[in-house]
């Protein structure tokens, strides 16, 4: 006979352990259980809840797994309206906001918080248990997304106190999670999300909560909507929320005058560049909550708070032409030629438009007036079309039917957004493949620029990568070409010869296999070690690698099923190009860095960032970009940034270059 009391107690115990582990991992970045221990406990809890569903707790961590499918979202009225904030865009407007408060309240303080670029949400708890989650909606009515919210790992299902309260927060998608999601969607041939906010919004509205669980959404909670539970100040409220188990944003400051406020705003400009999530401004609010009612609100927004929006550096230009280019894989990419304009410190004259669907979505036309900015402060992008300036002269952009280089009819696979030229003899594709082969992240033959490649191609000296390694046989032809002196020819031939020593991961990337980027080539080279192993691998075997999906596996199979590709690989091997990994997959020599998580910051004098990363990985290290308590070491060079300060606060061991060099020299790893 089963003892149900013991079963109930066991379930409660497992829930308590797993809830604590989740909080340690996702909120404090300080796990107290290994992955194996956590998985074992979770599996045990799932088994017990499956056998005894009557004992499943409403705040069980198994809810984080998802799997509930809604038919549609119901609409529920907010207990307290979710008001939007007014905006200010410059220091004069901030001063006006400040002065309006001073007229009514001579003595007060302000609290500044980051304005997270995400999706506003309201969370309702009864006796400390999450019972409802609503989107902002129109501020009065919101959609019930409770099942989805339960899967978000940084939303506590049970608070540390049994309170009835409603909190407000912002759901967001971090940059790493966004990049991973889009990489997966690209692999699955699905439309990419344009930015993390859109991805977060689209994810929250998924009817299947299992999809939400997979996308690693996060939350920052910033306020309590129940007046009787709030603390005297906003600062104390944030501390209280953190104590209850919520994740609050750490970047808040309390200031007592306008001069201090300006200093803090300057500080945020530095902070913003180091964040792993999007923020579009600063929220400035009166810190003392009792003063909020004195200042009041308009019908749309409170007067006691405002949002200072970070300036987006944009410029206006005119679309002069839209051309279509063919790449090394045959993909057709539209490029927008615009009237040259300065954007964020550099002259921009063209903008890549990704694909024809992108053109249609933004309705970009020749002679349109457009607003241009730099996405991620790097890549020029058309932010929007100024349709108020459009006339009858602007006609919809039509997709071309033939390859712009070889006039082959273009093809588009069902469900794909890209058009392709499938002609293997397309001149432009061949040139682009050669340019890719010699590029920095591939074979790194930097003396061969684009114009040199084209000149050699037009002279029938090269048509495929293996021809580069036969150029020395045509030295007499090179000597007759204008601009190619003896020294230049020697430099070219020496650089080509030196490239034979490049590692397997570089050569694999240089081959230009569809969907095989630099990171994927590193993963494949590390796993398979040789080109022969990769050739013989089935898609089923390849997809057993965690980072590799079926689309990449099929692309590899298709590449090695082509006799021309096999012949080219064979020629390259015969000519001395290495197709074997220089780094052993599992180094037997243990080092101080074996299985240790390491972050790099600053500039090393002896090594480039790529070189030291490869050395550390060969010594068994795991290189990460962001710094947290999970990291074992921080390696610092000159001009180290804020990561050094953070590591000191977190008491993470710091290794300087001199000490690092001694560790490398004392290791038994062959470099």
UniProtKB/Swiss-Prot annotation:
Transmembrane segments: none annotated. GO terms for cellular component: cytosol. Residues 588-671 form the BRCT domain. SUPFAM superfamilies: BRCT domain, DNA ligase/mRNA capping enzyme, catalytic domain, Nucleic acid-binding proteins, RuvA domain 2-like. PROSITE patterns: BRCT (PS50172), DNA_LIGASE_N1 (PS01055). Gene3D superfamilies: 5' to 3' exonuclease, C-terminal subdomain, 6.20.10.30, BRCT domain, DNA ligase/mRNA capping enzyme, Helix hairpin bin, Nucleic acid-binding proteins. Zn(2+) binds at residues 403, 406, 421, 426. DNA ligase that catalyzes the formation of phosphodiester linkages between 5'-phosphoryl and 3'-hydroxyl groups in double-stranded DNA using NAD as a coenzyme and as the energy source for the reaction. It is essential for DNA replication and repair of damaged DNA. Pfam families: BRCT (PF00533), DNA_ligase_aden (PF01653), DNA_ligase_OB (PF03120), DNA_ligase_ZBD (PF03119), HHH_2 (PF12826), Nlig-Ia (PF22745). GO terms for biological process: DNA repair; DNA replication. This is DNA ligase. Keywords: DNA damage, DNA repair, DNA replication, Ligase, Magnesium, Manganese, Metal-binding, NAD, Zinc. It comes from the Bacteria. It is an enzyme of class 6 (ligase). NAD(+) binds at residues 35-39, 84-85, 113, 136, 170, 285, 309. It comes from Onion yellows phytoplasma (strain OY-M). Its EC number is 6.5.1.2. The keyword Oxidoreductase does not apply. SMART domains: BRCT (SM00292), HhH1 (SM00278), LIGANc (SM00532). GO terms for molecular function: DNA binding; DNA ligase (NAD+) activity; metal ion binding. It catalyses: NAD(+) + (deoxyribonucleotide)n-3'-hydroxyl + 5'-phospho-(deoxyribonucleotide)m = (deoxyribonucleotide)n+m + AMP + beta-nicotinamide D-nucleotide. Belongs to the NAD-dependent DNA ligase family. LigA subfamily. Its cofactor is Mg(2+); Mn(2+). The active site is at residue 115. The lineage of its organism: Bacteria, Bacillati, Mycoplasmatota, Mollicutes, Acholeplasmatales.
């Amino acid at each position: 006979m089963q003892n149900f009391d013991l079963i109930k107690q066991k379930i409660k115990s497992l829930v308590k352990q797993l809830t604590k582990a989740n909080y340690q991992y996702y909120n404090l970045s300080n796990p107290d259980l290994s992955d194996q221990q956590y998985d074992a406990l979770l599996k045990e809890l799932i088994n017990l809840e499956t056998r005894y569903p009557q004992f499943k707790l409403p705040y069980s961590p198994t809810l984080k797994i998802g799997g509930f499918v809604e038919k549609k979202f119901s609409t529920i009225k907010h207990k307290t309206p979710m008001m939007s904030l007014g905006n200010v865009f410059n220091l004069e407007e901030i001063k006006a906001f400040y002065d309006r408060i001073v007229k009514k309240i001579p003595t007060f303080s302000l609290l500044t918080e980051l304005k997270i670029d995400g999706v506003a949400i309201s969370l309702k708890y009864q006796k400390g248990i999450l019972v409802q989650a609503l989107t902002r909606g129109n501020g009065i009515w919101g959609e019930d997304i409770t099942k989805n919210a339960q899967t978000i790992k940084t939303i506590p299902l049970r608070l540390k106190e049994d309170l009835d309260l409603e909190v407000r927060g912002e759901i967001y998608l971090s940059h790493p999670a966004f990049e991973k999601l889009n990489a997966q969607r690209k692999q699955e041939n699905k439309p990419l999300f344009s930015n993390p906010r859109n991805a977060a919004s689209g994810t929250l509205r998924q009817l299947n909560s299992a999809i939400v669980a997979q996308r690693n959404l996060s939350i920052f909670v910033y306020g309590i909507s129940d007046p009787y539970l709030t603390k005297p100040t906003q600062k104390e409220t944030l501390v209280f929320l953190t104590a209850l188990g919520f994740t609050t944003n750490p970047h808040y400051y309390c200031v007592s005058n306008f001069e201090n406020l300006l200093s803090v705003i300057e500080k945020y400009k530095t902070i913003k560049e180091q964040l792993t999530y999007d923020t579009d401004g600063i929220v400035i609010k009166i810190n003392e909550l009792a003063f909020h009612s004195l200042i009041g609100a308009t019908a749309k927004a409170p007067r006691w708070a405002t949002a200072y929006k970070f300036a987006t550096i944009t410029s206006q230009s005119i679309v002069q032409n839209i051309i279509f280019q063919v790449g090394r894989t045959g993909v057709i990419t539209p490029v927008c030629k615009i009237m040259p304009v300065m954007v964020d410190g550099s002259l921009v004259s063209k903008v890549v438009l990704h694909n024809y669907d992108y053109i249609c979505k933004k309705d970009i036309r020749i002679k349109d007036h457009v607003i241009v900015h730099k996405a991620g402060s790097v890549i020029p992008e058309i932010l929007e079309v100024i349709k108020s300036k459009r006339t009858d002269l602007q006609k919809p952009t039509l997709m071309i039917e033939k390859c712009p280089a070889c006039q082959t009819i273009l093809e588009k696979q069902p469900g794909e957004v890209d058009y392709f030229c499938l002609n293997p003899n397309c001149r432009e594709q061949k040139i682009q493949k050669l340019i890719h082969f010699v590029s920095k992240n591939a074979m790194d033959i930097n003396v061969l620029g684009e114009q040199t490649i084209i000149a050699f191609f037009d002279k029938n000296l090269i048509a495929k990568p293996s021809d580069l390694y036969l150029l020395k046989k045509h030295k007499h032809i090179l000597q007759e070409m204008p601009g190619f002196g003896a020294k230049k020819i020697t430099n070219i031939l020496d650089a080509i010869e030196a490239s034979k020593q490049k590692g397997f991961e570089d050569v694999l990337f240089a081959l230009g296999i569809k969907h095989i980027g630099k990171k994927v080539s590193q993963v494949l080279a590390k796993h398979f070690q040789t080109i022969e192993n990769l050739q013989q691998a089935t898609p089923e075997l390849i997809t057993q690698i965690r980072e590799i999906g079926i689309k990449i596996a099929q692309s590899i199979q298709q590449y090695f099923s082509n006799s021309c590709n096999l012949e080219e690989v064979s020629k390259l091997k015969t000519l001395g190009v290495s197709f074997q990994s220089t780094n052993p997959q599992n180094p037997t020599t243990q080092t101080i860095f074996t299985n240790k998580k390491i972050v790099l910051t600053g500039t090393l004098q002896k090594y480039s960032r790529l070189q030291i990363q490869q050395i550390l990985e060969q010594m068994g290290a795991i290189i990460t970009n962001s710094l947290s308590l999970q990291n074992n070491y921080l390696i610092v060079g000159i001009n180290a940034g804020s990561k050094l300060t953070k590591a000191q606060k977190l008491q993470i061991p710091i290794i300087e270059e001199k000490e690092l060099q001694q560790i490398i020299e004392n290791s038994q790893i062959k470099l």
